[in-house]
Amino acid sequence: MRNFIINRKIIFLTQSEKSKKAKVKRQKFGNIFTFYLLPFTFKSFAALRLCVFALILILPSFAQKIAILTPEKNGQSEKFAEKLTDSLSEKFKVLDSSLSETAFLSSNPEKPFNLTVEEAKIIGAAIGCEFFLLVRSENLRRYSFEKKEYFESFAAVYAVSSRTGRLVFWKLKTFNGYKSADAERLLFDSIADLAKEISGKLPNIAKEEFNEKVSKLEEIPDENSFEAKNFRSPLPYRRISPQYTAIANLYNIAATIDIEVDFDETGKILLTKIVRWAGFGLDESVTETVRKMNWRPATRNQKTLPIRVLLRYNFKKLEKEE
């Protein structure tokens, strides 16, 4: 039986709590990036939007700028990133790795493989790319009853949208061998197929995000605010804990998953968005669990109302006691 811990208490984050770190990040970069908007009439703005949409449809994917980063500095991660860069350069404009790395480090992400969407958007803006890829690769010694001692060479690739900050593509590639070099060779031989898969997905994601409509809903009010008076948050009738996935357990992943949930006035879930991601199946586990639960609607002065809430789940593997 796998040992892990998930906080069972559902944490509701208020708007001020959510935006506190984002404000600090934006202030940090506010002096670096300045954007000027020219006045547009409604018709000219609509025409401009149509032109931009047409350009997105007709421009080839190589016009999109991407950055490939290795937050964990080890030889295999850097070697994998170099080979992935070579494969993706045929379809995308891959930015200089040293410049991208400098911009990435300037944002000082505490957990680079467990970013919030706000942190990711700031990083993407600092780098100046449409997407950035985070690469983590290692060669591990494994043991099993069937194979006894063997080596596993793996690479986890995170593709992140600079526009939305969301994790839009995640892939784990693993290969085994009785020798370290054999496992590594098999992994590197798979890079061409991985690059092809990434090249097929990112341009389509860019089109989808451009057409995405953002709905506005009231959010959980601050505790001492006027809006909090006689307000009651939505709650599940029966709480369910999301599963700590087997793949997360195997790689000893500790992560926080934040999910934004839109409820209608009856407590029905309209939309869910992962706004702090981690990969390894944890995002999907949280989404599936939240959607399984039946929710009591939010109320103010005993009247039900639609609401947007932010829920947080913490995952951590527990080490076996000696």
Give residue spans per PLM region.
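Short beta-strand->alpha-helix linker/helix-N-cap micro-motif
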Residues: 65-73, 85-114, 223
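Short, solvent-exposed, polar/charged sequence segments at loop or secondary-structure edges
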Residues: 95-144
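Amphipathic beta-strand/beta-sheet edge segments enriched in Tyr/Trp
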Residues: 133-178
